[in-house]
Amino acid sequence: MNFKNIIKQKKQLVIAEIGQSHDGSLNYVHSFIDEAAKSGTDIVKFQAHFADEESTYQDQFRTFTTYKKETRFEYWKRMQFTNEEWFKISTHIKQRKMLFSSSVFSKKSINVLNKIGIDVWKIASGESLDLNLIKEITNISKKPLLISTGMNNQQEVDKIYNFMKSKKNLFILMHCVSQYPSNIKNIGINILSEYLKKYDCLIGFSDHSGTLEVPTIALENKISALEIHVVFDKKLYNPDTTSSITFSDLAYLCNFIKLKNKLYKHSISKNK
């Protein structure tokens, strides 16, 4: 599997965002990977958190996240994996003919994932203006980056774009809304066409609506990537559930792209 080849062949790649839906269970992680493969997704994405790098023992949750009696630090500690576990996650994804991606939030997470062979880097909206963090990646890796812009105004997006154009890494600028779930009135699907006109790079959409309709409509634009949170069941409690779709919905989106490509590939003439 090759990132550039996928885009050339499929035009629009699908990124299954697992996020924290595994709830710290390595067994769940591998179940998610297998289900993503069955759905036909191209990239499986996680979040590489390290509590010591991102939080303190006194750090409390600002919004309700878990029913467990734990601090934010303890939560991130429970969510993190060892280097060996990350290697097994990456290996499993590649064995299932998909690419491995993860959001990074610290220099440590960058170094760990670089050593195990990450395929696609992800910069979350909250880190998109941390150019030093992005520079840590571009200094040691030529792998592509997905950069979300859910917390940025237009001037800030311009700054990110200009910075990335000075680097050799392929990158996709991702429109998204940092609201979970995103209200339909706030999604701003018009931003996709504005990005496509304004920026000389690949454009994508990171969806947090928790619906099937919004990503389907987004795919009607000439975007190169769709990132979407997935869960096994919308009835199970998880911080990401309201912003996620199910794997059956994910399979629908993957099949929708395949069918759309076939339709546009086989044109007919009324002149015969």
Give the residues covered by each predicted segment.
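Catalytic cores and adjacent flexible loops of soluble metabolic enzymes
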Residues: M1-K272
